[in-house]
Amino acid sequence: MNCKILFRKELNDSECELSLLLVGDSDMKEINRLRRGKDKTTDVLSFPLEFDFSPLQKILPKNTSSDQKMFPPVALGEIVISIDTLQKQAKEIGHSEKDEFYRLLVHGFLHLLGYDHERGDKEEHIMKLKEDECLEILQGL
């Protein structure tokens, strides 16, 4: 079992890819300033390539065994993680850097899929449940 199973509905069984950029706090601060107008560092940023707010399953091609090789992977976007902040947060929370990396990666991935904790309490709750579900699987790896 892996995270792909958790997101089967969202990904419509399609092959997808994303870019992952690991940076220091100074670069993260600059990216955050340029892309979001916030002059501070942060732990993770996500930049989806699909700006249509339709559900992803309407956009992604259905992947069946016969046409698995027919479609190239769908590029979901980019996740940027600050290694400096990751290390600080792991120490503050009291878990490993690997666990913090997984937490930030899952958080960023959920944003690429359209989940957004900043849209209100209900959305935050839904995103937190998905995050916890995926992290439980990843911790077994």
Swiss-Prot record:
Q: Which residues bind Zn(2+)?
A: H107, H111, H117
Cellular component aspect of the GO annotation: cytoplasm
Q: Which domain of life is it from?
A: Bacteria
Cofactor(s) the record lists = Zn(2+)
Q: Which GO terms describe its molecular function?
A: metalloendopeptidase activity; RNA endonuclease activity; zinc ion binding
Q: Name one Pfam family in it.
A: YbeY
Disulfide-linked positions: none
**Cofactor remark from the record:** Binds 1 zinc ion.
Query: In which compartments does the protein localize?
Result: Cytoplasm
Report keywords, A-Z: Cytoplasm, Endonuclease, Hydrolase, Metal-binding, Nuclease, Ribosome biogenesis, rRNA processing, Zinc
Enzyme class (EC, first level): hydrolase
| Gene Ontology process terms (BP) | rRNA processing
Give the EC number.
Answer: 3.1.-.-
Q: What does this protein do?
A: Single strand-specific metallo-endoribonuclease involved in late-stage 70S ribosome quality control and in maturation of the 3' terminus of the 16S rRNA.
Q: Which family does it belong to?
A: Belongs to the endoribonuclease YbeY family.
Protein name stated in the entry: Endoribonuclease YbeY
Species of provenance = Leptospira interrogans serogroup Icterohaemorrhagiae serovar copenhageni (strain Fiocruz L1-130)
